[in-house]
Amino acid sequence: VELTGGEPLLQKELPELTRELLERGYEVGMETGGSLDVAPLDRRVTIILDLKCPGSGMQDRNLWANIERLKATDEIKFVLADRRDYEWAREVIARHGLLERCGVLLSPVHGELSPRSLAEWMLNDALAARLQMQIHKYIWPPGTRGV
């Protein structure tokens, strides 16, 4: 079961819900924008943490303490608008040892950064992160809901 959409951590019942799902034998993942504390969640929940880059205009909302709570089964995602975001993400990845801590995903902002450019930067730097595409944005027209 993956919990996403909006910000799941805004729901005060989330820790209880995830514990109940885990007790019933489900694997539980939760995608978060990274501005709220993940500490109340059971450690068995897989965290997908979206760390905001400078190009988002929301980097001041990052709760950096969340990085220290990430484990090998978790992932951290950087959505990159440009080369500046890429360089910022590389520095954060190195400073926090993220490649050794958890899965690292780099995703280009659709229509702003070409996937090819991002792939080339990653290859040139031998950056062992994964390139993630928001594939639905390439399949359906912009603004399509429910996909």
What residue spans do the PLM features occupy?
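Short Fe-S-cluster ligation motifs
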Residues: 1-5
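Conserved AdoMet/S-adenosylmethionine-binding subsite of the radical SAM
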Residues: 9-147
